[in-house]
């Protein structure tokens, strides 16, 4: 299997969006081969439907056991197993609606896109489209 250059991660709750941006951390149970340097595109429900709201580059991957007790309790509550720490996170000025991207042809929506692996050319095309 070819390794991914990055992934799509969906931020499921509106209140978690600011938490991700403020802490540069994303807690997940998604069983992927996370690696330092991978790019993650953030997807969230917006007024336009599902839309890309930004992206980040992974700096570190922490197991639940490496986290603070408070973080471990939150992980237990939500079933998360890892924390992705980002080197930086960029918020798009305007969300990029999924239906305006090449990914619309996949016929996937919402949680079905969570954890979807992407190659570098797909990542770059989506980021360029969102920032363009």
What name fits each language-model region?
Residues 1-35, 51-53, 64-132:
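Contiguous surface segments at macromolecular interaction interfaces
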Residues 11-12, 43-45:
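Acidic/polar N-terminal loop/beta-strand segments that form early-domain functional surfaces
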Residues 32-44:
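Short coil-to-beta transition motif at edge beta-strands of beta-rich domains
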Residues 46-57:
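Short coil-to-beta-strand transition motifs
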Residues 59-63:
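Short edge-strand/loop segments of extracellular domains
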């Amino acid at each position: 299997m070819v390794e991914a250059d990055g992934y799509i991660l969906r931020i499921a709750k509106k209140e978690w969006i600011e938490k991700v941006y403020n802490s540069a951390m994303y807690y997940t149970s998604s069983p992927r081969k996370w690696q330092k340097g991978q790019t993650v595109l953030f997807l969230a429900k917006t007024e336009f439907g599902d839309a890309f709201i930004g992206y980040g580059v992974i700096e570190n991957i922490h197991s639940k056991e490496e986290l603070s007790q408070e973080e471990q309790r939150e992980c237990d509550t939500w079933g998360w197993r890892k924390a992705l720490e980002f080197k930086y996170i960029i918020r798009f000025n305007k969300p990029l609606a999924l239906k305006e991207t090449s990914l619309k042809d996949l016929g996937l929506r919402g949680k079905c896109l969570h954890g979807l692996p992407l190659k570098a050319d797909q990542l770059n095309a989506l980021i360029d489209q969102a920032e363009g």
